[in-house]
């Protein structure tokens, strides 16, 4: 039962954070950020939000991370007003490398296909 609740909360946080980033956060450093997943601890006290960006540049990734860190307070307070839970979890943002990894695999497969 607890895992079911955690799963629902993860989906709800992902949906709400995506909406908040699109509509409430005005920082240009976080434009183009896609929330790819959320992991919430079993006690619902901490949430790790995984995101991806379209740019491959390291400087862009650093700027995005700084923008998200700066906006964490706003995002958490908005989540608190939108979610019906006792305590809003602490938020941490981590860049999701799986999108970049997947595109690299696609490039390698295309190269192999063109060599044949």
Swiss-Prot record:
InterPro entries: KH_dom-like_a/b, RbfA, RbfA_dom_sf, Ribosome-bd_factorA_CS
Pfam families: RBFA (PF02033)
GO MF entries: ribosomal small subunit binding
GO biological process: maturation of SSU-rRNA
Localization, UniProt: Cytoplasm
UniProt KW Lipid metabolism keyword: no
Keywords, in A-Z order: Cytoplasm, Ribosome biogenesis
GO annotations of cellular component type: cytosol
PROSITE patterns per record: RBFA
Family: Belongs to the RbfA family.
Reported function: One of several proteins that assist in the late maturation steps of the functional core of the 30S ribosomal subunit. Associates with free 30S ribosomal subunits (but not with 30S subunits that are part of 70S ribosomes or polysomes). Required for efficient processing of 16S rRNA. May interact with the 5'-terminal helix region of 16S rRNA.
Subunit structure: Monomer. Binds 30S ribosomal subunits, but not 50S ribosomal subunits or 70S ribosomes.
Identification of the protein by name: Ribosome-binding factor A
Species in which this protein is naturally found: Levilactobacillus brevis (strain ATCC 367 / BCRC 12310 / CIP 105137 / JCM 1170 / LMG 11437 / NCIMB 947 / NCTC 947)
Annotated gene: rbfA
